[in-house]
From Swiss-Prot:
Designated gene of the protein: rplK
Name listed for the protein in its UniProt record: Large ribosomal subunit protein uL11
Family designation: Belongs to the universal ribosomal protein uL11 family.
Pfam families, sorted: Ribosomal_L11 (PF00298), Ribosomal_L11_N (PF03946)
Origin: domain of life: Bacteria
Organism placement in taxonomy: Bacteria, Pseudomonadati, Spirochaetota, Spirochaetia, Spirochaetales
């Protein structure tokens, strides 16, 4: 049985799906740990080519003592999915007074289903409440209170 590799560090990055490059922030984050940025970028782009190009994808890179690495893709941030669903560039600067968009219950459910694997919520309803809170803090009006 092979010996387990010793983990040196874990690096959290957010990269555009299918469009990552060794330029900052990827190269400077991986370089000090001896990880080949072009090799990571190629593997990342291969694994994210089925996703919508440019969609921000969080990734956790685990670096081992022999300078090898592995990485885990996470689901896109809730704010990114909300902005995409509403068709807006950014949230409101004053979320209480200024509403910038409206999120339907169907859109809320769809986003919650996408995010559920990476959330601490145990049920879809709990995930919908979390996503609704994020939307409200962005100045997006949620169709129905949960």
């Amino acid at each position: 049985m092979a010996a387990k590799k010793k983990v040196v560090t874990q690096i959290k990055l957010q990269c555009p799906a299918g469009k990552a490059t060794p330029a900052p922030p990827v190269g400077p984050a991986l370089g000090p740990h001896g990880v080949s940025a072009p090799q990571f970028v190629q593997q990342f782009n291969d694994r994210t080519k089925s996703m919508e190009p440019g969609l921000v994808v969080p990734v956790v890179v685990t670096v081992y003592s022999d300078k090898s690495f592995s990485f885990v893709l996470k689901t896109p941030p809730a704010a990114v999915l909300i902005r995409k669903a509403c068709g807006i560039e950014k949230g409101s600067t004053n979320s209480v007074k200024q509403k910038v968009a409206r999120l339907s219950l169907a859109q809320l459910t769809e986003i919650a289903q996408v995010k559920l694997p990476d959330m601490s919520a145990l049920t879809l309803d709990a995930a919908k409440r979390i996503i609704a809170g994020t939307a409200r803090s962005m100045g997006v009006e949620v169709e129905r209170s949960l």
